[in-house]
């Protein structure tokens, strides 16, 4: 999803302050401005521009040394493009661990009584190992000013959805027999995942107590959806000539939909009676071959809610169609899946509401999986059509993953949503506190990219009472040239801030790292930082990597990962979890950007759609988005000899301040055993934790 490429947006200038008192904390200007701020939301937004100390603001990427000597930053168009848009923007500095906590800003329009406990969403987990999310709401950010639940969330929270009510009995509707059939070599998931008990389906997975007949109701549901004449989000797999009987099947589909269309507006009982009558008539005029498409729809059990308004019902039916299509793909009922995709491609659009947009991404991903399955094995699916994957060398993105255009798209996410800022300054705060009073410090960044996380951290070290320590950063990345360029830029910044600095580049994949590459030195305090990166390390290499990190005896290890379970062994479970997770993200984008926003469309197309495609369409080594929940990471880290370190009250306070700077009230901050989770409404999105040996 969002990784360290998004980075910190900061101004890069220091100023000769010999005639000014030394700040006792790099966050002092933030704290003072917050003390004088009023409680209105307008004033809250005004303070967002005062978070960077005045001594660090400049209208250009220049570094002053002694007032009259000027050093121009290196000619790095990528850095200049990234930072130039944010020279006037504030950013979060790091609180000294000795400072007192500051209350969170609270706008007068906030309602602190907001509580989602009645929704019961915390019982949603396919793997059964999710922590009790959002059980300890923090501050004034549990407000009800945000959006209501999306159609997908209403599916999960509907009282009619019996299979969504209890975590120990969470069920995918009527698939237990299918899962049993795939216990052996025919499983559709897994492959390179982390080994633990969640890699097999729990026997607690059950089905709703009442069987729902898809044969009777899916056709009417299809016709009741609003047809759109806009261009399709992706090509329909039903038009693929590689599928046998394509033209004749389309004709049968048309007849089938026409025959069942009159049921759309009828009540449930009337629809059943009318269908039975039509079936009797069909038996007299149709052959057994024409009846097969109807017979293939048996045992697909997705409940259709009754009594909702038309808009909600349309969104819910769209969700049911996606689940039915995913189940057909999982059961290898390809002709039936083709028909669902044919209809989905007619009703979804990347320009509609959040439910339609996320459905468009999942529809395209299902099409890619089905198309590849019909021509080759899922393991060979590549991510190289209309949905680029920035992490794959085989993707056919309109521009390279490290181009200025992509960086600008990441910057849009960084500015519009708090997820990346939360990851960076929470990790930086933990590292800063672990380095207190240390004279020589060493940071190993396991995914340095452009190094955007570190300018604010370096500013904090420069403002430390007593002067900055000697700082060494080891940057790891797959491309040594890019890592070296990042080191050159950070070296220039450190020089402008008068920080003794050294950069050590390592051009390797994480699974290929060796202990000597860290260049560990005696007398240095060590921190290891990983933001949204460890989930991509193959399971067979993850244990060795963590053991090697532990042997380096770091003072602190900061781990930030997406709070989702996308590494289960079964395709249908991963699909449902991903649908829930990305629906929440698209909802947050919907509340952040204006309607018909071109920026939002770029974010969804080039950041989140490739992730969805990788989770849904790819298998084996090609499936790299293997997100795990915080509880799973706890087991992994503790199993390798690490113990958790509670994030400090300063981290909590600054997270509250961060959320107060965003106009949307849907963001939620919670604590879980010393860790912090940031989410949207009732769904956790990202989790931050700290560890020691």
Swiss-Prot record:
LxCxE motif (motif): residue ranges: 323-327
Tissue-level expression: Present in roots and leaves. Accumulates specifically in arbuscular mycorrhiza fungi colonized roots.
Residues spanned by motif VHIID: 441-445
Residue numbers spanned by region VHIID: 410-475
Renumbered residue ranges of the record's region SAW: 617-692
Region Disordered, residue ranges: 1-43, 233-253, 268-298, 378-397
One annotated Gene Ontology cellular component of this protein: cytoplasm
One example GO MF annotation: protein homodimerization activity
Chain spans, region Leucine repeat II (LRII): 485-516
Region listing for Leucine repeat I (LRI), in residue ranges: 316-391
PFYRE: annotated span: 526-614
Description of the deletion phenotype: Ineffective symbiosis with arbuscular mycorrhiza (AM) fungi (e.g. Rhizophagus irregularis) with abnormal AM-related genes expression, leading to rare colonizations characterized by malformed arbuscules.
Pfam families: GRAS
GO biological process, one term: regulation of DNA-templated transcription
Keywords: Cytoplasm, Nucleus, Transcription, Transcription regulation
Induction annotation: Induced upon root colonization by arbuscular mycorrhiza (AM) fungi (e.g. Rhizophagus irregularis) in roots and root tips. Regulated by a complex comprising CCaMK, CYCLOPS, and DELLA during AM symbiosis.
Feature: compositional bias, Low complexity: 284-298, 386-397
Residues covered by the GRAS domain: 309-692
Subcellular location: Nucleus; Cytoplasm
Oligomer status and interactors: Forms homodimer in nucleus and cytoplasm. Interacts with RAD1. Interacts with NSP2 and TF80.
Annotated family: Belongs to the GRAS family.
Described purpose of this protein according to its UniProt entry: Transcription factor acting as a central regulator of arbuscular mycorrhiza (AM)-related genes (e.g. PT4) required for the morphogenesis of arbuscules upon symbiosis with AM fungi (e.g. Rhizophagus irregularis). Also involved in restricting mycorrhizal colonization of the root meristem.
Entry protein name: GRAS family protein RAM1
Species for this entry: Lotus japonicus (Lotus corniculatus var. japonicus)
